[in-house]
Amino acid sequence: MSKTISFRRDDELASAPPSMLRRVIPTRLRRTFDLPSHRLRQAILPRKFLSRRAGRATAVSASDGHRPTLYIDLAIISSHDAGTGIQRVVRALALAIARRASGNWEVRFVSAKRTRQYHVIDWPKAAGQGSVDPIRAKPGDVFLGLDYSLDTLRWHRGQLKRFRRDGGSLWFLVHDLLPSQRPDWFSPNTVLRHRIWLDMLAALADGFLCNSAQTEADLLAEMDEYGLPRRDYRTSVLPMGHDINQARHEDAPRDAASLDRIAALAAEPFFLKVGTLEPRKGHLDLIRAFDSLWARGLDQKLVFIGRLGWRVDALHDAILAHAEFGRRLIWLDDVDDAGLIEALRLCEGVIVASHAEGFGLPLIEALGHGKPVLARDIPVFRVQENLGVHYFPADATPETLADDIQRWRDAIRAGAVAVRSPLVGWDESTEELFKAITGNRRL
């Protein structure tokens, strides 16, 4: 039989070793990785016994005159920029931070490999340039996990723990919690890596930047499952910019072949769907709806721009075997940012059919380019209703969706669809980012 552990006073609990604390934490709060000692105490001890490292670091920084350094994680995008929506966000924010950096902070981009710890890189210049030394924190420094670095956090957990012990704080950008919420939409490997990534965040993070109020609510619910009191970490909703041009390197080469493929679409009107091909994005729903529209005699192209994702064998086969593939059903799987901008310029409208999103960057990018948007009626898309977005029912059948597309198309051509551009750009996003991680101190 297991021995029951009890504590007569809170101070006895506060001084208990981690191995004993793990025996009293509720089983439902345990995850793949045990919480480290400081998080265990935050989960189960009264507040009067806890001190916040971030507060101490800020006080030291203010008193000794040290100019803090912001280390920005670009471990994925610096080695392989696949051009996804998440990577456009990472690139846009990183470039905006570099543009707006002033004398209050040192800004350094960092990367890591399996066998090499986080170190400074000279991004966006050629990979491999930069420092060979691992980064170390001074009090008041901040590590910002801007990139979606699922594996590098696990590989270099010890380095990040030391960064925090040395007086630095750790912040992370969270795009969505979908692999945890809907594992059936993702590969088992992605689900496992995402779960371990969440374990790392629960163990290490001082704060989180979320791309929407929905993502923030989902994250808070996840952290509650770890038993972490909400007073012991911070969250902030970061408004997203919309201008794809601001997410491009100034010297980024243009893919002439990509632009030629896009230009060829201009001969006939088309609707555009942007995003990685994956189950939740609604590509099959659109194909079935357009089958109905084409059967009615509607001569309108449907264009997909996005790379092949996961668990999409049926979708992949449906596209390639479709009678209209290459004619009225077009799939472009390798389009750079310049090509995407041109596609948005030429299209008649953008359809956002995702069943779930953390934010929905293609929607806001389309509005930023003045294009009408028809979106699935889910809460995260309703936030943009005042900008002129039209909606179709979340559970629409192919016929219902076809009807909504046809009505929307007729309204566009009648001049009855008014679109307003979003007000927030990437520079404004960066200002809010710095207010969140520094307590309203300016970049």
Enumerate the language-model features and the residues they cover:
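Carbohydrate transferase catalytic cores enriched for Leloir-type hexosyltransferases
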Residues: S2-L443
